[in-house]
Amino acid sequence: MKKKLLYIDHSFHNKTKSAQFLEELLCSAYDVETCDFDPYDKNPDIIFDSFTGRDFDVLVLFQVMPNIKKLKEQISFKYPVFFPMFDASGGLDDAFWEQYREFNIINFSYSLHKRLLKLGLSSYYIQYFPKPIETFDFGDPAHVFFWQRVTDLGIDMVEKLLKKNSYNRIHLHRVLDPFQTFRSPSRCIADKVEYSDWYDTREEMLKDVESYAFYIAPRLYEGIGMSFLEAMAMGRCVIAPNFPTMNEYIVHGENGFLYDYHYPKSIRINNIDRIQKNAYEYVKEGYAQWEVNKYKILDWLEAPLGGSVPLPMEKQKKEFIIKKYTFCGKFPLLILESKPYKRYYKLFGSWCVWKCKRKGNKIIFYLFGFIPVWKASYW
């Protein structure tokens, strides 16, 4: 008889099917009950009322962060497990993670895994790869696919990045995350843009992506990065911000391109066929490893708290970017320090005059680093 597992997942995955791989893996070893959690609901925790008094061997939270205290009051479980996403929790304060000290945490982001180990949490790391297509063609090198999901990464950024390259069509998929604002193309490229608002099936969208040589990653940060990984699995040339998880897969100029989001410059792209082939082969090799390693997840679900030692990476990537403006090349005048969902502007190298920080679905801007002066919706 299989043990009982309660799987609490983001309701958005009902549409995207991007978490289906994990649910199938869990079902191979457990009797799984699913719960769709909508963090944008006014009272999201009410969904747990239907599970009040129930007992489970394992509780799995995937990409959702409900009220842990209330969860414990309503549901009994022996082994709690949390799959965090870098885009949602990578920039949260250390204090946030205290509530997960009794959890085994399974990370798809190496950057977040390292941080949680430093906090003394029980963290495990595994890198996901989707199944590559059996054969691929290179697509049209003059065509670009871009899905705008967030306000801060719009068609204007695509125009900057491709300024030095020749293209005649941009497919703009305008389905945004909650609380985001669409950006219209400039007059210079408006006649090159075609639009879509949604696809009946995920397969229809992937078929369109496959016909374009270029794929612009849709967000600044990712949890796993399913969208750009599926593009790489089809041999697309992915252009992405130099942030996790994109920079944990993409090596600039080898199997894709990374850019500085705060100081974007046009990327001169040559030998695109080589980039596409490298991307495809990279995912093909990674998928073979994933098929072997994915069963470790089942071992980690009920493992004693402790976690694993960080795995060495071939190429370590910076977790944040620092820009310095100096006088005579020596004396610091202004320093811009950028971390996930945090930016600091410091005068003379130490005096913090401006900081913005994400809390929930808001970004709060602080004067002198501690006086809140403005609040805006983020996603």
Give the residues covered by each predicted segment.
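Short alpha-helical segment that forms part of, or immediately flanks, the ligand-binding pocket
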Residues: 206, 229-233, 247-248
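Aromatic "clamp/platform" in nucleotide-sugar-dependent glycosyltransferases that forms part
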Residues: 220
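Conserved catalytic-core segment of nucleotide-activated headgroup transferases in glycan assembly
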Residues: 16, 131-202
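Short hydrophobic beta-strand element within catalytic cores of glycosyltransferases
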Residues: 237-240
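Catalytic core of nucleotide-activated saccharide and alditol-phosphate transferases
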Residues: 19, 37, 65-158
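A charged, aromatic-enriched C-terminal amphipathic alpha-helix characteristic of glycosyltransferases
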Residues: 261-318
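Short acidic/histidine- and often glycine-rich active-site loop of Leloir-type glycosyltransferases
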Residues: 243-253, 257-258
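N-terminal pre-catalytic "stem/leader" segment of glycosyltransferase-like enzymes
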Residues: 1-67
